Amino acid sequence: MKQSKLLIPTLREMPSDAQVISHALMVRAGYVRQVSAGIYAYLPLANRTIEKFKTIMREEFEKIGAVEMLAPALLTADLWRESGRYETYGEDLYKLKNRDNSDFILGPTHEETFTTLVRDAVKSYKQLPLNLYQIQSKYRDEKRPRNGLLRTREFIMKDGYSFHHNYEDLDVTYEDYRQAYEAIFTRAGLDFKGIIGDGGAMGGKDSQEFMAITPARTDLDRWVVLDKSIASMDAIPKEVLEEIKAELAAWMISGEDTIAYSTESSYAANLEMATNEYKPSSKVAAEDALAEVETPHCKTIDEVAAFLSVDETQTIKTLLFVADNEPVVALLVGNDHINTVKLKNYLAADFLEPASEEEARAFFGAGFGSLGPVNLAQGSRIVADRKVQNLTNAVAGANKDGFHVTGVNPGRDFQAEYVDIREVKEGEISPDGHGVLQFARGIEVGHIFKLGTRYSDSMGATILDENSRAVPIVMGCYGIGVSRILSAVIEQHARLFVNKTPKGDYRYAWGINFPKELAPFDVHLITVNVKDQVAQDLTAKLEADLMAKGYDVLTDDRNERVGSKFSDSDLIGLPIRVTVGKKAAEGIVEIKIKATGDSIEVNAENLIETLEILTKEH
């Protein structure tokens, strides 16, 4: 493919509105262009990368018997009313009317559509299982699109749906998809973790998220590629190294979610779902009597603890939530933070929000800072974190402004439902007892769910079982964010390329180091002087030889300065660069491996053989 024939509008500077490196490089390297807020055009390079990823997916899904189809993006609102999601999905749903004033939506996901198609066509358990998927643009009216392709209003997604006559059959397909996803993301060159996830608006119970890890850019050996003109990091002057470190740190670490994972086992979970090892403790101290104490001007746990000279771990944090219009009191040990996802899931609530100061005062008779679980109205629902039941003689709010109660003992002074509703902390023991928890940021690239009968129940999707009884179809759902794969790969494979000029100056610039499986082309073939006929002829021969061996080749045939060609090559990020330069008449070309910065001169006749050796090594 001739570079002069492609639309690759590279920029000399990073875009000023980009906050994450993937967004900046996709724009600067000519992969994407924003058409309007949250809506992007995928230019030829991005489209080739996405198509390569689609090929990987199709190959892996074929192995597990998944069949591709295509559903409409424009959906009747009646389907979503049938499932109940038309009203509950929220403001992110694109709603529109046709000329007949009928309601439609632009699909953000397609559970209802696939459920309807199968409901109308499948009548017996003998027709199951079915395993269907599509690759399609989706739509979500994001309030604040940001970070390039990570949070957009239009995005490309692979969504799959499986249909079963029982849960045992669903379990088999769910495991097939889990393994297929691991194979897909491994082939794509991603550093990822499969983690315990939350089903959220999708419904369902068991779910697993696949998160591309986005580590901090502190490891120079990982993030910096040195040109052959620089022997090692030690050769770079200290002040230049400091500039390089500052440049690495200048870009925000992307990743919507925090992951908690074990240092010594396979345990990993979204922070919203993460838990830790818990061991109930036996009470050894005698229980004191309740005593009301004045705590003037103390509104926070740390202020109360300091005023009463107690540790924060001996205090009870009392919060009030409204769950589906009902008040719920939540209790935590004072130095812990509430995990609202855990609380919402435990309550099986559709809506959960913190109560206002006015609602708290109406319920407790006091304002924030003085709330507590003692002497609440009969029938009050109290959900306490499991650590609270280990407390003896704790401090809690007295439900009286400016006062607290000491000597509070769970069981004696209040009754509660005990469950894990706290946010875990780094360094705590993993729930499997192996290793401690560490945190990392991550980008969600895939999510699989066991939906069960969530949609078949609401939409009447039933089959006749072995006993001719009508039973709901059991479903699974499997998504991959195709367009955000591009962002995730660049976040992990962006590199700062450093070189030394003949005058001894150090220069550095960002570029992409694409893994081979997803690079838009395998080889960047550059002719230094397009007016040199010998070089042109050698380039044409090498291009033909490479393509005959199955390499995708991007040939830079532009009449541009060699410096511009090399800069664009670093930006675009193909794994291999072959330069036909001053030694073309001698049949000598230069090979550069992008990942390491290593380069070597070889006879053009040995190019293919040398590339095969080098690519095996790297």
From Swiss-Prot:
Highest rank taxon of the organism: Bacteria
ATP-binding keyword on record: yes
GO cellular component: cytosol
Pfam families: HGTP_anticodon, tRNA-synt_2b, tRNA_edit
Signal peptide range: none
Main location: cytoplasm
Biological process terms in GO annotation: prolyl-tRNA aminoacylation
GO MF, one annotated term: proline-tRNA ligase activity
Keyword flag Nucleotide-binding: yes
Keywords: Aminoacyl-tRNA synthetase, ATP-binding, Cytoplasm, Ligase, Nucleotide-binding, Protein biosynthesis
Enzyme class, UniProt record, top EC level: ligase
Reaction(s) the record says it catalyses: tRNA(Pro) + L-proline + ATP = L-prolyl-tRNA(Pro) + AMP + diphosphate
Record-listed E.C. numbers: 6.1.1.15
InterPro entries per the UniProt record, alphabetical: aa-tRNA-synt_IIb (IPR002314), aa-tRNA-synth_II (IPR006195), aa-tRNA-synth_II/BPL/LPL (IPR045864), Anticodon-bd (IPR004154), Anticodon-bd_dom_sf (IPR036621), Pro-tRNA-ligase_IIa (IPR002316), Pro-tRNA-synth_IIa_bac-type (IPR004500), Pro-tRNA-Synthase_IIa_type1 (IPR023717)
SUPFAM superfamilies found in the cross-reference section: Class II aaRS ABD-related (SSF52954), Class II aaRS and biotin synthetases (SSF55681), YbaK/ProRS associated domain (SSF55826)
Subunit structure: Homodimer.
UniProt-listed NCBIfam families: PRK09194.1, proS_fam_II
Family: Belongs to the class-II aminoacyl-tRNA synthetase family. ProS type 1 subfamily.
Domain notes: Consists of three domains: the N-terminal catalytic domain, the editing domain and the C-terminal anticodon-binding domain.
Name by which UniProt lists this protein: Proline--tRNA ligase
Species assigned in the record: Streptococcus pyogenes serotype M2 (strain MGAS10270)
